[in-house]
Amino acid sequence: MKLKFCGFTSIKDVTAASQLPIDAIGFIHYEKSKRHQTITQIKKLASAVPNHIDKVCVMVNPDLTTIEHVLSNTSINTIQLHGTESIDFIQEIKKKYSSIKITKALAADENIIQNINKYKGFVDLFIIDTPSVSYGGTGQTYDWTILKHIKDIPYLIAGGINSENIQTVNQLKLSHQGYDLASGIEVNGRKDIEKMTAIVNIVKGDRDNE
């Protein structure tokens, strides 16, 4: 199982997380997010992440110029799109930056299968998150059984996942590749090493299927 920890805002937290066997660390570049980081800040934070961990920049409906600024000024190797980005736009990114991974976040709603089919083949990974009227993480969960119909597609489960409820998700025997956490590894808005370690022990312990 893969683990992505997201929404980092301090070198201290990045360094602590990087000592754990996780697969990706995310930084949010979206001004309406409480975890927003400037490109300069992301450059500094990403430089503290070792090369074996993917460095993800989360954006909402960015233009190509913004993506160019992120990729040319930081060590980011994955772009995570949280808006209504078009297939043409994604293809444009891929054409210009063939080595960059692209992740697409989708809401776990009645249109999930339709939206997966729309983006399938154009992105490297899906993040399936709690439906929300605004973009970005809510810290709220959803009915995970909606994911039972999703097979043969690489995706991570996001949305209020923490060490208390992750076992419930595991018992559903879904086809997900792992989890994406932000608020579930925080205390008072800061990443918490005990919470991060607890999640790692659950997900990367005897259930690691990589």
Swiss-Prot record:
Transmembrane segments: none annotated. GO terms for molecular function: phosphoribosylanthranilate isomerase activity. Pathway: Amino-acid biosynthesis; L-tryptophan biosynthesis; L-tryptophan from chorismate: step 3/5. InterPro entries: Aldolase_TIM (IPR013785), PRAI_dom (IPR001240), RibuloseP-bd_barrel (IPR011060), TrpF_fam (IPR044643). Gene3D superfamilies: Aldolase class I (3.20.20.70). Disulfide bonds: none annotated. SUPFAM superfamilies: Ribulose-phoshate binding barrel (SSF51366). It comes from the Bacteria. Keywords: Amino-acid biosynthesis, Aromatic amino acid biosynthesis, Isomerase, Tryptophan biosynthesis. Its EC number is 5.3.1.24. One of its GO terms (biological process) is L-tryptophan biosynthetic process. Pfam families: PRAI (PF00697). It catalyses: N-(5-phospho-beta-D-ribosyl)anthranilate = 1-(2-carboxyphenylamino)-1-deoxy-D-ribulose 5-phosphate. It is an enzyme of class 5 (isomerase). NCBIfam families: PRK13958.1 (NF010563). Belongs to the TrpF family. This is N-(5'-phosphoribosyl)anthranilate isomerase. It comes from Staphylococcus aureus (strain NCTC 8325 / PS 47). The gene is trpF.
